[in-house]
From Swiss-Prot:
The gene is Xrcc2. Involved in the homologous recombination repair (HRR) pathway of double-stranded DNA, thought to repair chromosomal fragmentation, translocations and deletions. Part of the RAD51 paralog protein complex BCDX2 which acts in the BRCA1-BRCA2-dependent HR pathway. Upon DNA damage, BCDX2 acts downstream of BRCA2 recruitment and upstream of RAD51 recruitment. BCDX2 binds predominantly to the intersection of the four duplex arms of the Holliday junction and to junction of replication forks. SUPFAM superfamilies: P-loop containing nucleoside triphosphate hydrolases (SSF52540). This is DNA repair protein XRCC2. Interacts with RAD51D. Part of the BCDX2 complex consisting of RAD51B, RAD51C, RAD51D and XRCC2; the complex has a ring-like structure arranged into a flat disk around a central channel. In the absence of DNA, the BCDX2 subcomplex XRCC2:RAD51D formed a multimeric ring structure; in the presence of single-stranded DNA it formed a filamentous structure with the ssDNA.
Length: 278
């Protein structure tokens, strides 16, 4: 965080920071092809309207991480930052129960011990939380995945509190974006952050200061509205949607690698047991 901290960093902490992170290439083969496998320092944006399976996918990936290797998991730690106060522990436990061959209380406790939860109620609190993570990341080399659900929670609040100044509207999220990039790079993490579709496709009336259309996104309907600092650090964008039927449990996603501009489409169902790819 600061020069004083860096001078105090021990050799053990340095090794933990640089060498102790497990590979996440096998996180979800159904979602990430070999060439798009997540690597340390990658930042993924999960984008879409409410109710399109973004948080369910986060539960799925979290379960994959915290399950023991003997049960097909990666046996690594996850930090989940909830800004909507929508995190459903019972839902995650249900997903884990369906994946544990012996769903004992002890086995469940061991899985959940690998999960760290933080709650934030404002963009400033999110920024302060991120600033406080460095000591945790140094001391927990098995903590490999950082999740923020959702990064767009405070968009309208920040826009109002910033008045007519675009710089003030975006100031805190810009700092959060820059800090997230530094943390995932220096500590060799993987970041998944969700953003909600607040801007209607083709609508210009509610454009934010950083909103822009992306013709190369084709029919995905992505409309950037968060600060340019965030748009710059994202390496992969995954657009979620729901099939036409209002109560359909079938969802679709389009994954776009922003450097190569390659697109991949997937479909999945949300069952009681969690996400199932079609």
């Amino acid at each position: 965080m600061c020069s004083d901290f860096r001078r105090a960093e021990s050799g053990t902490e340095l090794l933990a920071r640089l060498e102790g992170r497990s590979s996440l290439k096998e996180l979800e083969p159904n979602l990430f092809a070999d060439e798009d496998s997540p690597v340390h320092g990658d930042i993924f944006e999960f984008h879409g309207p409410e109710g399109t399976g973004k948080t369910e996918m986060l539960y799925h990936l979290t379960a994959r991480c915290i399950l023991p290797k003997s049960e097909g998991g990666l046996q690594i730690e996850v930090l989940f930052i909830d800004t909507d106060y929508h995190f459903d522990m019972l839902r995650l436990v249900t997903v884990l129960e369906h994946r544990l061959s012996q769903s004992s209380e002890e086995a469940m406790k061991l899985c959940l011990a690998r999960l760290f939860l933080a709650y934030c109620s404002s963009s400033m609190q999110l920024l302060l939380t991120l600033h406080s993570l460095e000591a945790l990341l140094c001391s927990r080399p098995s903590l490999c995945l950082l999740i923020v659900d959702s990064l767009s929670s405070f968009y309208w609040i920040d826009r109002v509190s910033g008045g007519e100044s675009v710089a003030l509207q975006e100031s805190t999220l810009q700092k959060c974006s820059q800090l997230l990039e530094r943390l995932v790079t220096e500590y060799r993490l993987l970041l998944f952050a969700t953003t909600q579709s607040l801007m209607q496709k083709g609508s210009d009336s509610a454009d934010g200061p950083s909103s822009s259309k992306h013709p190369c996104d084709g029919d995905m309907g992505y409309r950037a509205y968060l600060c340019k600092a965030w748009q710059r650090v994202v390496k992969h964008r995954v657009i979620f949607s729901r099939d036409d039927e209002a109560k359909s449990s079938r969802f679709s996603l389009v994954s776009r690698h922003l450097k190569s501009n390659s697109l991949k489409k997937h479909s999945f169902m949300v069952r009681e047991s969690g996400v199932e790819f079609c």
